[in-house]
Amino acid sequence: MSVKVGIVGAAGYAGAELIRLVLGHPEFELTAITSNADAGQPLSAVYPSFTGVSDLVFTTHDAPELKNCDAVFLAVPHTAAMAQVPALLASGVSCFDLSADYRLNDASVFEAWYAAEHTSPELLKTRAFGLPELFCQDLETAASDHADGKPVLVACAGCYPTATSLAAAPAVRAGWVAENGPVVVDAISGVTGAGKSCNARTHFCSADENLEAYGVGKHRHTPEIEQILGLTDRVVFTPHLAPLKRGLLSTVTLPLTPQAIDTLTLEDVVDHYKQFYAGRTFVRVLDAGQQPKTASVVGTNAAQIGLALNKRAGVLVATGAIDNLCKGAAGQAVQCANIVFGFDERRGLPTVACPV
């Protein structure tokens, strides 16, 4: 029996990627797509690539058919999910939120960084965090709850936190990272990471042939990265916009303990990372001397990790590459839904990028 799926915010870039993945999923049936701006428009009129594939029509976000779904993905701006998730859960619908509304454990931290009131902080205690490779227990618990007939809420990790944390977590959890000093994260994303609404930074004439840092010292993904890695007030995160449609590269410079500096070799580090991610289909740890490329992961739910050990400076440099729209958004949400509904986490998800 197929899982009936709805997508709120389906006309945005992450929403459109969700449509692509859900329509190709053997266990999912897409029954509702919403967009307040495009309500009444056929999907194929907004995205012609779906011509002949689906005859769905966009409805408004308050469409009653959402409550008849088994799962609803919410790909909406921050604070918008809070307006719908409680009612959907009360109707027995499991929710997979791609926004930041339920990612942070502490509502006061959310309110400080997003300058908005959190209207359902009680859900932060029960939601699962959607980064399967690092929080498998959360999703296993959610799957158990769903099997018992309970609707669940999964807060899917953000794009920058996903690439950054996958690159850094094995070293952090191994105890190699020094207790003091900044952890520097320099990340670059394609323009789709900024969403579909155009602004002065993402306009073609501004973004083309240009690299630009933004949100320096104040980007909202900072507390999420710190929460995942357990590095409170230590992450110096600087995102950059690149003239790419999609793709994200995050380079993390981790200060090492004296013992790690003295004893580790690059081969040790690579072996540890490969063991850490053993059995995790979507994470590929590259051999020593190799570095990841966004072109190797775009269009897939895969992540590539490259490692370099700089003993002179006493740091480990870990770089992660993902597709910001797939592993950083829609693909990760589908991966989480697969786990919750008892399917193989790989079901319906692409793993190999076009080689050229």
PLM segments and residue spans:
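Alpha-helical scaffold segments in soluble metabolic enzymes
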Residues: E17, L21, L166-P170, E224-I228, ...
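N-terminal Rossmann-like NAD(P) cofactor-binding subdomain of oxidoreductases
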Residues: M1-A207, Y214, A308-K311, P355-V356
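C-terminal lid/capping helical subdomain adjacent to the catalytic/cofactor pocket in oxidative enzymes
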Residues: N324, V334-V356
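C-terminal substrate-binding/catalytic lobe of Rossmann-fold NAD(P)-dependent oxidoreductases
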Residues: E27-N68, P182-A187, V191-A318
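Bilobed periplasmic-binding protein/Venus flytrap-like ligand-binding cleft at the lobe interface
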Residues: A157, V177, V269, V334-C336
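Glycine-rich phosphate/pyrophosphate-binding beta-alpha loops
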Residues: L241-P243, I322-G328
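Conserved active-site and cofactor/substrate-binding residues in soluble primary-metabolism enzymes
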Residues: Y13, T126, T162-L166, V216-P223, ...
